UniProtKB/Swiss-Prot annotation:
A GO cellular-component term linked to this record: cytoplasm
Superkingdom: Bacteria
One GO process term, biological-process aspect: protein refolding
Protein name (Swiss-Prot/TrEMBL): 33 kDa chaperonin
Disulfide bonds: 236-238, 269-272
Gene responsible for this protein: hslO
Length: 295
């Protein structure tokens, strides 16, 4: 089934909500990185967070999330855009930690101490950046803290996954609810109560709940309009041409040394695992191009 996100706003204009299912996208990305179950859960949460944040920027803009902790997973890096494209990776895909009750321990895998940095490429000279300390290292709570502290928007975020014992991605999804200025404290209180009473999100997802059905439960009793429905999918912007531009920037001396010592160059994209091979003839051509630019 195609992953997608719905965006809605209360008819009163006081609340906006985003709900998405990312199961297929997470499955594809985790397969590319050959992740173990806990790393799969962590990456799945990050991808979902990225999809939610990507829907808040305008066409042509991008957002990057970087969760860095002191645990064995080390980091979760996600990039997403306004079109629903998302990509990501973790520092160590082979991390697999369990809590005493047998649940996947994403929090300690990432590490309790660390930071979340959000960078938005809004088409300006420099991207906008905001950083907060990790709150729980569970991803959803950390993103909510960022939105409240850095963007000053009262927000509630829920992200959940259902990973089978064999590591298969059975269901992943999430929601983001925000109070729209001027903020009504009573509306915020009502929403928080409603979220607390919601059945476990992982159960709703595993039972086949789609974004519209989850949205209906989140905003039960609150009249709302669905503004948009957009597909979410893995997409990587890497290409041989981009890698070649990086090699061009390295200079003749380093490329000549690479040719002599390694007889070529192999570059692997961290986001998708695609391998790009440049043999000695390729390096000679790039070195010649540098010489031409310098003359």
């Amino acid at each position: 089934m195609t992953d997608y996100l719905v965006r809605a706003i209360a008819k009163s204009g006081s609340v906006r909500a985003l709900v998405c299912v990312t199961t297929a996208t997470v499955g594809e990305i985790c397969k590319r990185h050959d992740t173990l179950p806990t790393a799969t859960a962590a990456l799945g949460r990050g991808i979902t967070a990225g999809a939610l944040m990507g829907s808040l920027v305008k066409t042509g803009q991008r957002v990057a999330l970087r969760f860095e902790g002191n645990g064995p997973l080390k980091k979760i890096v996600i990039e997403a855009d306004a079109n629903g494209s998302v990509r990501g990776y973790v520092g160590d895909p082979k991390v697999h930690l369990l809590r005493p009750d047998g649940a996947l321990d994403v929090n300690n895998a990432l590490g309790r101490a660390g930071f979340l940095t959000v960078a938005k490429d809004l088409g300006l000279k420099e991207p906008y950046r905001g950083t907060v300390q990790l709150y729980t290292s569970g991803i959803a709570e950390d993103l909510a803290l960022y939105l409240v502290e850095s963007e000053q928007i009262p927000s509630a975020v829920g992200i959940a996954e259902f990973i089978e014992q064999d590591g298969t991605v059975a269901a992943v999804g999430g929601f983001l609810i925000q109070a729209v200025p001027p903020v009504d404290p009573l509306v915020v209180e009502e929403l928080m109560t409603r979220i607390e009473q919601l059945p476990p999100l992982s159960e709703l997802l595993h039972e086949g709940g789609n974004p519209e059905q989850i949205l209906e439960q989140l905003l039960a009793g609150i009249p709302y309009d669905i503004l948009e429905k957009r597909n979410i999918a893995f997409a990587c912007s890497c290409s041989r041409e981009r890698i070649e531009r990086v090699l061009l920037s390295m200079g003749k001396k380093e490329l000549s040394s690479m040719k002599k010592d390694q007889h070529g160059s192999e570059v692997t994209c961290e986001f998708c695992g695609e391998r790009y091979l440049f043999d000695e003839a390729d390096l000679d051509r790039i070195i010649a191009e540098i010489a031409k630019q310098e003359s």
